[in-house]
């Protein structure tokens, strides 16, 4: 995806060097150092699409004649059929494709590059391919959200311990826990959709950076390529890669969401609170009893790759002057690597949770550890009229007095402490049955029926909201894909007029 000053095409019969650049610098070790041809396989199809749209526009504007346009478009079809591996040597895929066209058509093949620099060509190809990757990642995330919603439906009554600082905090449910990540993935979806809007802009027609004297139609190439709009300023359009930063940032944020989920599952697995399916675990080479959550550990580890990609991209772009610098050749790979890695992580993380076994009895017992129902007892006293801070003091004293094998105080212990602090019997505020219910993790969860809480009715409402959000995002995704597909159909229809 390199670029530089464009050159006139020399004699097409000279095959010793790439057709496009043979009139200038000789070959040597630096030539291979400059080349990104191998890496550019990812944007091979994108370049062909960009070339076709550009040639159709040139012919429509009578910048090149119809016969030449037809010859070039036919040559591009041959190049596509031959594939990336058959391209001649070149600094990048763009130069190699142009050389392959000139080899087939002759010097007139060089007219394909009229009114264009590789600067705007490269930018268009990156945007074209990146939007496809974004949509694929969004589809994967949407699928993961659907899996998590199904887990929430199935486990809405499965009580589990909730933690802060990795210490037992309050009882919750598997459904409530899993929906917390589904909601985070909703926001990750939104960030990717937002990035798509700024990626899907057409830089073609900007040329090197100062536009072109030819009467090009930038809106036409935008329509043929499925771009929603034109990137307005020609210098910015050719030079900027901030859309890569925005996309990679969204991907790194998504990876961070996944790392939290992965860490939760790793910790829960270590306590016997979840049993991963064998497909998402491995054993030790020496300790046959082990069932290790390796896949989740790798999801956690790959987050570092995504963050490193973002840092690498920002470092690459830092301090680059307008308008083009070869540093940019290294920019795209940071985004591609992050996207590929995190897309796999989404699939693995969601699959691990969806296929896991959640042992209800074990989890309910664990939900009593460390007097995790303490907040519920304090809330019960507060609802009976005791100032919350006073209620907090009563329960804190009870927690401090627990023995090493005790998970929660009984009614008598709480009653004695309450009388010491309040100056009157506990029964003045709450009866025994209500207090014992508050000490029970299942009842404690049922009490927490505020919007967004873990109580079954509150979870059911969250599931409903999540399903609606999922449907809305699926619709947006389908619309984006349809727009791209329709543009491809329009482009092929126009190409067929010439070939």
Swiss-Prot record:
The keyword Lyase applies. It is an enzyme of class 4 (lyase). GO terms for molecular function: argininosuccinate lyase activity. Its main location: cytoplasm. One of its GO terms (biological process) is L-arginine biosynthetic process. Residues 7-22 have a biased composition (Basic and acidic residues). It comes from the Archaea. Signal peptide: none annotated. Residues 1-22 are annotated as: Disordered. It catalyses: 2-(N(omega)-L-arginino)succinate = fumarate + L-arginine. One of its GO terms (cellular component) is cytosol. It is found in: Cytoplasm. Its EC number is 4.3.2.1. Pathway: Amino-acid biosynthesis; L-arginine biosynthesis; L-arginine from L-ornithine and carbamoyl phosphate: step 3/3. Keywords: Amino-acid biosynthesis, Arginine biosynthesis, Cytoplasm, Lyase. Belongs to the lyase 1 family. Argininosuccinate lyase subfamily. NCBIfam families: argH. This is Argininosuccinate lyase. It comes from Haloarcula marismortui (strain ATCC 43049 / DSM 3752 / JCM 8966 / VKM B-1809) (Halobacterium marismortui).
């Amino acid at each position: 995806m390199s670029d530089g000053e464009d050159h006139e095409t020399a004699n097409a019969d000279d095959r010793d060097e790439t057709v496009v650049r043979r009139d200038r610098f000789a070959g040597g070790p630096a030539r291979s150092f400059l080349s990104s041809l191998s890496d550019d396989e990812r944007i091979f199809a994108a370049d062909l699409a960009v070339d076709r749209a550009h040639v159709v526009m040139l012919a429509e504007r009578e910048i090149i004649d119809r016969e030449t346009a037809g010859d070039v478009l036919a040559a591009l079809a041959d190049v596509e059929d031959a594939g990336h591996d058959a391209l001649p040597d070149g600094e990048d895929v763009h130069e190699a494709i142009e050389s392959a066209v000139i080899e087939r058509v002759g010097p007139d093949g060089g007219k394909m590059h009229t009114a264009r620099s590789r600067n705007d060509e490269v930018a268009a190809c990156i945007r074209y391919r990146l939007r496809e990757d974004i949509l694929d990642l969004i589809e994967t995330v949407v699928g993961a959200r659907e899996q998590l919603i199904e887990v929430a439906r199935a486990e809405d009554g499965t009580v589990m311990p909730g933690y802060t600082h990795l210490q037992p905090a309050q009882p919750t449910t598997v459904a409530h826990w899993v929906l917390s990540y589904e909601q985070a993935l909703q926001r990750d979806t939104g960030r990717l959709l937002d990035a798509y809007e700024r990626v899907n802009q057409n830089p073609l027609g900007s040329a090197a950076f100062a536009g072109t004297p030819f009467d090009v139609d930038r809106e036409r190439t935008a329509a043929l390529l499925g771009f929603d709009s034109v990137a307005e300023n020609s210098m910015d359009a050719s030079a900027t890669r901030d859309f890569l930063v925005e996309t990679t940032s969204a991907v790194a944020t998504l990876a961070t969401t996944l790392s939290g989920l992965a860490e939760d599952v790793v910790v829960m697995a270590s306590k016997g609170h979840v049993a991963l399916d064998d497909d998402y675990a491995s054993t030790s080479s020496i300790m046959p009893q082990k069932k290790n959550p390796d896949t989740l550990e790798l999801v956690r580890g790959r987050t570092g790759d995504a963050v490193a990609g973002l840092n690498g991209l920002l470092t690459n772009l830092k301090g680059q002057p307008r308008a083009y610098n070869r540093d940019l050749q290294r920019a795209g790979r940071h985004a591609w690597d992050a996207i590929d890695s995190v897309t796999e992580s989404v699939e693995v993380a969601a699959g691990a949770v969806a296929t896991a076994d959640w042992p209800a009895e074990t989890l309910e017992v664990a939900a009593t550890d460390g007097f995790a129902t303490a907040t519920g007892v304090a809330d019960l006293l507060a609802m009976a009229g005791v100032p919350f801070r006073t209620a907090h003091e009563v329960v804190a004293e009870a927690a401090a007095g627990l023995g090493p094998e005790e998970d929660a105080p009984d009614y008598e212990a709480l009653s004695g402490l309450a009388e010491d602090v309040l100056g009157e019997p506990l029964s003045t505020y709450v009866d025994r049955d209500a207090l014992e219910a508050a000490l029970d993790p299942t009842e404690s969860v049922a009490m927490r029926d505020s919007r967004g809480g873990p109580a079954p009715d509150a979870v059911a409402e969250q599931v409903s909201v999540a399903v609606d959000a999922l449907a809305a995002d699926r619709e947006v995704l389908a619309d984006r894909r349809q727009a791209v597909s329709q543009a491809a159909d329009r482009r092929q229809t126009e190409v067929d007029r010439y070939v």
